[in-house]
Curated annotation (Swiss-Prot):
Disulfide bonds: none annotated. Belongs to the malectin family. It is found in: Endoplasmic reticulum membrane. This is Malectin-A. Keywords: Carbohydrate metabolism, Endoplasmic reticulum, Glycoprotein, Membrane, Signal, Transmembrane, Transmembrane helix. GO terms for biological process: protein N-linked glycosylation. Residues 229-247 have a biased composition (Polar residues). The keyword Membrane applies. GO terms for cellular component: endoplasmic reticulum; endoplasmic reticulum membrane; membrane. Residues 275-276 are cytoplasmic. Residues 204-247 are annotated as: Disordered. Residues 1-26 form the signal peptide. It comes from Xenopus laevis. Widely expressed throughout development including the anterior neuroectoderm and neural crest at stages 18 and 20, and the retina, hatching gland, otic vesicle, epibranchial placodes, pronephros and tail tip of later states. At stage 41, expressed in the liver, pancreas, branchial arches and proctodeum. Expressed broadly in adults in fat, intestine, gall bladder, eye, muscle, kidney, stomach, liver, heart, pancreas and lung.
Length: 276
């Protein structure tokens, strides 16, 4: 009779082979994250295993707000809504310094949700990374609406002492400076942020937003309709009716008539004079 160990040994090997990648993916994602902060809030471990530390700017720069704690956040996992419900803002520009020891490919993820204003053009600001503007005129409400999660995903490359982001290059000295820049409308803010090794494809996506997807589809349809109408207008312009006659062509014949009359009078007159 086969022993239990003999039977279960190969079975365990098969299970580890099949399930191993799934477990490795979850832990692998958290291992790629080198720095994460829950801005304006306490420490938190999300559903992907990413450990967000308590905000290091507490009591130093800006103000923490938990105003969003009373609101459900769309597009976010229920367990991770706290990452969008708390925030840090400041009446002037502010930011975080992130130490990076190794060169390579990185992704900076910035998390936002508008939990106060209920219309666009109320809070608009920029985001800079080491002096490079990576997000211009961010209007969270205009992007996704009220109490809805929004992530900005920014790939970064650090090689041979140079930082490359969105086509711009600068010298890198081991510190990534993420700055939220005050604009003309209210104060800059952030709900949470992290940086990880890898590419944008490695970043977990937010849940779909039916209303947002419908809006994007409508905008795409409008762009296509606009392009089609322009082509039709151009086509109609090519065949817009018969050509207008050239007015100068008729003027040539009218000029020739007096000349011919003059010749007709001059020749008989000359003939008569010669006979005299």
């Amino acid at each position: 009779m086969l022993s239990i160990r003999t039977v279960l040994g190969p079975l365990a090997t098969i299970l580890l082979t099949v399930l191993g990648p799934f477990g490795a993916h979850g832990s692998g994602l958290a291992d790629k994250v080198i720095w994460a902060v829950n801005a304006g809030g306490e420490s938190h471990v999300d559903v992907h295993g990413i450990h967000y530390r308590k905000d290091p700017l507490e009591g130093r720069v800006g103000r923490a707000s938990d105003y969003g704690m009373k609101l459900p956040i769309l597009r976010s996992n229920p367990e991770d809504q706290v990452l969008y419900q708390t925030e840090r803002y400041n009446e002037d520009s502010f930011g975080y310094d992130i130490p990076i020891k190794e060169e390579g490919e990185y992704v900076l993820v910035l998390k936002f949700a508008e939990v106060y204003f209920a219309q666009s053009q109320q809070k608009v600001f920029d985001v800079r990374v080491n002096g490079h503007t990576v997000v211009k005129d961010l209007d969270i409400f205009d992007r996704v609406g009220h109490s809805t999660a929004h992530d900005e995903i920014i790939p970064i490359s650090i090689k041979k002492g140079k930082l490359s982001v969105q086509g711009e290059v600068s010298t890198f000295t081991g510190k990534l400076s993420v700055e939220f820049v005050k604009g003309y409308y209210d104060n800059p803010k952030v709900c949470a942020l992290f940086i990880m090794k890898g590419t944008a494809d490695d970043v977990p996506m937010l849940q779909p937003h039916p209303g947002l997807e419908k809006k994007e589809e409508e905008e795409e349809e409008e762009e296509e309709e606009g392009s089609t109408s322009k082509k039709q207008i151009n086509k109609n312009r090519v065949q817009s009716g018969p050509r207008t006659p050239n007015p100068y062509a008729s003027d040539n014949s009218s000029l020739m008539f007096p000349i011919l009359v003059a010749f007709g009078v001059f020749i008989p007159t000359l003939f008569c004079l010669c006979r005299l």
